[in-house]
């Protein structure tokens, strides 16, 4: 019975996935995933990305955000990306594979960044979901806290932070922590974010060095 339920659920997910207009549009335009449209909507509204910027992309695989970032910052910009999963190489993207939670990986990432010269830190990280809501929420909040800590180590004064956060326990405190570090903080729910998902994007600007 369980296998039948899982099979039916999987079939529904696959149908929804391939019927999804954002999936179809991503395939048509050569983007690696539909997630690019979430970032594009944030960029359309907040205009944070410009040529020659240095940006850090956390949770980068399969790479649609890095693709988009490389286009926006251009040849004179720099995209430094990290993910625990492998990612096929992209022109203009310096990719580091490893677990961002491990000290050695964090140190290697900081070495590539080389000082407080980052204009924007972006995080689309999410933990492997276990199905236990409280465990999954704690894991996701830990990742966003690490991303905020990365901002404190590498962001320029007045730099920006775009981070995916799941609403739930710990969200309000994290939002306050971000407000303590940035002058302006907005919450975005892009159209490309599935309605049933608890994910939102915190968009913070004006980093207080």
From Swiss-Prot:
S-adenosyl-L-methionine binds at residues 63, 65, 83, 99, 124. Its EC number is 2.1.1.166. GO terms for cellular component: cytoplasm. Its main location: cytoplasm. GO terms for molecular function: rRNA (uridine-2'-O-)-methyltransferase activity. The active site is at 164 (proton acceptor). It catalyses: uridine(2552) in 23S rRNA + S-adenosyl-L-methionine = 2'-O-methyluridine(2552) in 23S rRNA + S-adenosyl-L-homocysteine + H(+). Keywords: Cytoplasm, Methyltransferase, rRNA processing, S-adenosyl-L-methionine, Transferase. Belongs to the class I-like SAM-binding methyltransferase superfamily. RNA methyltransferase RlmE family. Specifically methylates the uridine in position 2552 of 23S rRNA at the 2'-O position of the ribose in the fully assembled 50S ribosomal subunit. PANTHER family: RIBOSOMAL RNA METHYLTRANSFERASE, RRNA METHYLTRANSFERASE 2, MITOCHONDRIAL. This is Ribosomal RNA large subunit methyltransferase E. It comes from Pseudoalteromonas translucida (strain TAC 125). The lineage of its organism: Bacteria, Pseudomonadati, Pseudomonadota, Gammaproteobacteria, Alteromonadales.
């Amino acid at each position: 019975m369980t296998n039948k339920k899982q099979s039916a659920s999987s079939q529904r997910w696959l149908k929804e996935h391939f019927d999804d207009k954002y999936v179809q549009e991503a395939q048509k335009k050569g983007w690696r995933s539909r997630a690019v449209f979430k970032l594009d909507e944030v960029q359309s509204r907040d205009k944070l990305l410009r040529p020659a910027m240095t940006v850090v992309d956390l949770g980068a695989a399969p790479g649609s955000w890095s693709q988009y970032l490389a286009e926006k910052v251009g040849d004179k910009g720099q995209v430094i990306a990290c993910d625990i999963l492998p990612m096929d190489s992209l022109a203009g993207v310096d990719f580091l594979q490893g677990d961002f939670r491990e000290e050695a990986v964090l140190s290697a990432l900081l070495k590539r960044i080389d000082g407080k010269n980052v204009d924007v830190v972006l995080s689309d990280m999410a933990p492997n979901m276990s199905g236990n809501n409280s465990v999954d929420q704690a894991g996701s909040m830990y990742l966003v806290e690490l991303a905020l800590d990365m901002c404190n180590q590498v962001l320029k004064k007045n730099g920006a932070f775009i981070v995916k956060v799941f609403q739930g326990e710990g969200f309000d405190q994290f939002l306050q922590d971000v407000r303590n570090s940035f002058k302006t903080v907005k919450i975005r729910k892009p159209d490309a974010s599935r309605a049933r998902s608890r994910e939102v994007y915190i968009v913070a600007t004006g980093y207080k060095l």
